[in-house]
């Protein structure tokens, strides 16, 4: 899980979602998991 000031899709399988008011990226590739914070 990377915590970054701005999250971006890295590949076409990445999805940007909002969870508990946080913007997150989830993906099949676990290296692409990101959270904004």
Curated annotation (Swiss-Prot):
Keyword set, alphabetical order: Ribonucleoprotein, Ribosomal protein
Pfam families: Ribosomal_L36
Gene Ontology annotations of biological process type: translation
Entry GO MF terms: structural constituent of ribosome
Any one of the GO CC terms: ribosome
Family: Belongs to the bacterial ribosomal protein bL36 family.
Annotated NCBIfam families: rpmJ_bact
Name by which UniProt lists this protein: Large ribosomal subunit protein bL36
């Amino acid at each position: 899980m990377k915590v970054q000031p701005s999250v971006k899709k890295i590949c076409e399988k990445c999805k940007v979602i909002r969870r508990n008011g946080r913007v997150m990226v989830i993906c099949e590739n676990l290296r692409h998991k990101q959270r904004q914070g």
